[in-house]
């Protein structure tokens, strides 16, 4: 079956001298992996630089449902980046988001709302001109909504401790260790009220920001089985020191 779809690059693994295994989140079919042969010369469309993290591409291929690795017929750039490749901060964020999405969408089928959210977020990051130190935090929070486990912050009126397992506030300290103290809980409420346009208004120290990311990653681990340690988090910790 011939498929034409837009797709977002999540991960690229070198396979031999002239091939790549590329994981995409596609608009029409969700997660798919491709075996891509890249030319050794400058000729040909399948250039290695097309498959950088979060690149938004147009794909054409013959879909084989029983195959773990699809093969591209044609590829082109849908949304050219104007700033992400040239900004160390944006590049670091894009690497973090690509790794996050690679784990978080492993079993996702076609999900138009999720795809649109990711694509719009990538475009916003590329064009952003103000402070972006909180971008990945806002992205992670909003992504949890699309994945179906967004915390219930409305319960904050009835408790001081945020329960990471149940995703809501509790009046008393939970019987397990996966909960936030009062200070972290109130900070979480403030963060959940932010969007990309207002995130610059909320200032945090390096320690506070890293703590927020650690908390949200712990929440992801509790709600997404097999969610691993994020290697790219260390890069962000250094960038926004």
Predicted regions and their residues:
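Non-catalytic alpha-helical scaffolds and adjoining flexible linkers that form interface surfaces
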Residues: 1-241
